[in-house]
Swiss-Prot record:
InterPro entries reported in the protein's UniProt record: DUF402, FomD-like_sf, Ntdp-like, SA1684
Residues that bind Mg(2+) 2: D105, D107, D120, E123
Catalytic activity: a ribonucleoside 5'-triphosphate + H2O = a ribonucleoside 5'-diphosphate + phosphate + H(+); a ribonucleoside 5'-diphosphate + H2O = a ribonucleoside 5'-phosphate + phosphate + H(+)
Protein name: Nucleoside triphosphate/diphosphate phosphatase
Origin species: Enterococcus faecalis (strain ATCC 700802 / V583)
TM segment ranges: none
UniProt binding sites for Mg(2+) 1: N87, D103, D107
Active site: R23 (proton donor)
Any matching Pfam family: DUF402
GO molecular function: magnesium ion binding; nucleoside diphosphate phosphatase activity; ribonucleoside triphosphate phosphatase activity
Function: Has nucleoside phosphatase activity towards nucleoside triphosphates and nucleoside diphosphates.
Cofactors: Mg(2+)
Family assignment from sequence similarity: Belongs to the Ntdp family.
EC number(s) per entry: 3.6.1.15, 3.6.1.6
Lineage: Bacteria, Bacillati, Bacillota, Bacilli, Lactobacillales
Amino acid sequence: MGIPKEGEFVTIQSYKHDGHLHRTWRDTMVLKTSEYSLIGVNDHTLVTESDGRRWVTREPAIVYFHKKYWFNIIAMIREKGVSYYCNLASPYVLDDEALKYIDYDLDIKVFPDGEKRLLDVDEYEFHSKLMDYPEDIDFILKENVKTLVDWINNEKGPFSPEYVDIWYQRYQQLSKK
């Protein structure tokens, strides 16, 4: 697959460090691609878990992936404001099948009031031992937690006040075509 164009759809596949498929999102609409990043939107998107369970996303969400940073960001647009779910994960790759990354368990959730929570530390520690995460991965992930918190605190990139509005409006324009 070449670089997807604005308005096209991609599948997103999340893997675990041991190589098994963790979760799949069908039909994420691409809003923008650049040399290093992809911005898309999920809106009532079918999600399939590794155990076969399926569910559909409840609200629109702007997704941000980068080829250099070890995280991806989901901005969920809800009635009470935007909530962010940030996955500590490998940089993404794109092939003929899907956009793919490795999920490293740690997550940061940002609530509409700005409260931040680091989630799934126990899961990270368990999988780190079970799947034998290398020390350099542990170091990279911890450094990227710092980068992510800096972005959140300084409203950089997907955390800027205008970001969600701009990309949600673009999604609405594209979905009317």
